[in-house]
Amino acid sequence: VLSGVGHSARDTYEMLHKRNVEMTVKPFAIGVRIEHDQAVIDESQYGVEPSSLGLGAAEYSLVYHDKETGRTAYSFCMCPGGQVVASASENGGVVVNGMSLYARDSGVANSAIVVNVGPDDFGTHPLDGVAFQREWERKAYELGGSNFHAPAQTVGQFLGLSPAPSVQDSTY
């Protein structure tokens, strides 16, 4: 039997494990969601206002392969003209996702920026990946004020290039 439940079906994983169903550890990706002014992305991709070309809001895709570590960081689920939305499946954890509005006209682009992780990062027990996710979701919850607000910072802060002004605008 092959089960294709989603990554948030943790109660299902735990129930199957308790019933001694054979489970295999799988690598996955974990990361953050980044927001940009959509006009900056449009200019970067098209060089002009997209409507002047009869186009909608621009998308992008980024990939970086680190040959030394074997890790890959990449953009995922890029949402032009959208917003960041809450996606937590458990109390005490913060998870966010992105979505585009139908017209893709919110003026804000967002994308997940993720990195691959595997058993070397979280362990070889079948439920170690679940524990790893929960740990990071709990840390995000605490950093956001323990009220389901997502922690936020600028790219400059994330990269250690700028002091810590407060984030002025976020769709979340």
Regions found by a protein language model. Give the residues of each.
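Residues forming the flavin
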Residues: 1-172
